[in-house]
């Protein structure tokens, strides 16, 4: 597979994990997952991690995977690339894993004294990818092995931070986020 094909497959395969956190920001709010509880004088997660945001984010990622499966034949023909279909387990684990990764990073932020919205370089950009891929590898190891070869994984690791900063910058410019990272 050439470089363009590798990038296309990497982005396609990760879209169900890329979308959930954006959807959670747009539709979040409501009751915090941690219920306001603290550990060592610091909130466990903070007000930014809510049940509604997690549910909406996960649903958005799954819905996108369903849509991508429907579009896959036409997209593959148009792009000239073999695109992976998402098995149901991958749909759920990519989307939910992305949310869990972001929640875990929030927990780490609080434990290290960072406030909500504070920058946490590398962790902020890759937390959701690591957990989404790990959960998906547990659920559908053959699919992950077939889809995420080394070139695709490297592409995901390089592209994700740039995409993360770009989308957060756009959300900040639109007034949806309080900080651009």
Curated annotation (Swiss-Prot):
UniProt keyword terms in alphabetical order: Cell membrane, Lipid biosynthesis, Lipid metabolism, Magnesium, Membrane, Phospholipid biosynthesis, Phospholipid metabolism, Transferase, Transmembrane, Transmembrane helix
Catalysed reaction equations from the record: 2,3-bis-O-(geranylgeranyl)-sn-glycerol 1-phosphate + CTP + H(+) = CDP-2,3-bis-O-(geranylgeranyl)-sn-glycerol + diphosphate
Regions that span the bilayer: 7-27, 55-75, 80-100, 128-148, 150-170
UniProt-annotated location(s): Cell membrane
GO molecular function, one term: CDP-2,3-bis-(O-geranylgeranyl)-sn-glycerol synthase activity
Cofactor (UniProt): Mg(2+)
Subcellular location, principal: membrane
GO cellular component: plasma membrane
A matching Pfam family: CarS-like
Topology with respect to the bilayer: Multi-pass membrane protein
Database matches in InterPro entries: CarS, CarS_archaea
GO biological process per UniProt: glycerophospholipid biosynthetic process
EC numbers for this chain: 2.7.7.67
Domain of life where this protein originates: Archaea
Pathway listed: Membrane lipid metabolism; glycerophospholipid metabolism
HAMAP family, per database record: CDP_archaeol_synth
Protein family per UniProt: Belongs to the CDP-archaeol synthase family.
Role according to the record: Catalyzes the formation of CDP-2,3-bis-(O-geranylgeranyl)-sn-glycerol (CDP-archaeol) from 2,3-bis-(O-geranylgeranyl)-sn-glycerol 1-phosphate (DGGGP) and CTP. This reaction is the third ether-bond-formation step in the biosynthesis of archaeal membrane lipids.
Protein's recorded name: CDP-archaeol synthase
Species of origin: Halobacterium salinarum (strain ATCC 700922 / JCM 11081 / NRC-1)
Gene: carS
